[in-house]
């Protein structure tokens, strides 16, 4: 917490093509942790002593844009602040009659698109696949499990960190759910997937990836979306120790970042949005309140404090 501070600043006047947005909901996401390391990556690190950024939904209070009027609700990438000056090209209209604001930051937004891309483009899910997803009670993981069912999976297995989350996964339609905090992850997964795994959607890395490799069937596919178990590690990871199995099993392990697949958004909305709107795909939101809660909400992502999408209501 000592690495964050809250500041009040004077905002400049709007330039042509800009809007002033009062944020109502801000998101925090695990990928932000990677932007706190000064290393070369797919996205530049955050600048020291400058505002954090992230997804947000808010109401236009002033406008010098022909695209947006005062009172419009928009989503944009300048969260972590209560008021933002946004270029019109960064904003997208949001219809709160279709879904609440948090949904546009989660299941209907980049979170849902991440799950869909990982399954369809990276893991190339097929009819009858057995799918395992780690971090399954999180925003992406819970979407993966439900999308997989509608994309033809014959069995869906998830891992989570409490009995409450395990119960929730079963309510969401997972065939089996593992509480990894009970230990013997490999043994639990062996019991949950007696016929092996065809697709592993990895949000965790480490021992989860090791356990999944051990249960993967020949020609299995791993979509490597995140490695939350390692983001705060100061020592080299101890797992996976069985990567050589990928050779004999002819496995495909493929990492991805969403920015390379934004052109899939239209297909995602066409196929998945009706399922979300009808309630066939459900989603959870964990809410904290006030701009002061942003750092704490972010840190909770790494200790299991969220079920589904973590947002901060202004």
Question: How would you describe each model-predicted region?
Answer:
Residues 10-28, 36-80:
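Glycine-rich beta-strand-centered segment in the early N-terminal region that forms part
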Residues 52-59, 67-135, 280:
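NAD(P)H dinucleotide-binding glycine-rich loop of Rossmann-like/cofactor-binding domains
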Residues 75, 132, 178, 200-201:
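N-terminal Rossmann-like NAD(P) cofactor-binding module of classical short-chain dehydrogenase/reductase
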Residues 105-183:
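Mid-domain Rossmann-like dinucleotide-binding core that forms the NAD(H)/NADP(H) cofactor-binding site
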Residues 125, 193, 216-217:
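A generic alpha-to-beta junction signature in SAM-dependent methyltransferases
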Residues 169, 207-281:
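Glycine-rich phosphate-binding loop and adjacent beta-alpha segment
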Residues 184-195:
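Short amphipathic alpha-helix with an adjacent loop that forms part of the alpha/beta core around
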Residues 259-314:
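C-terminal hydrophobic helical "lid"/dimerization subdomain
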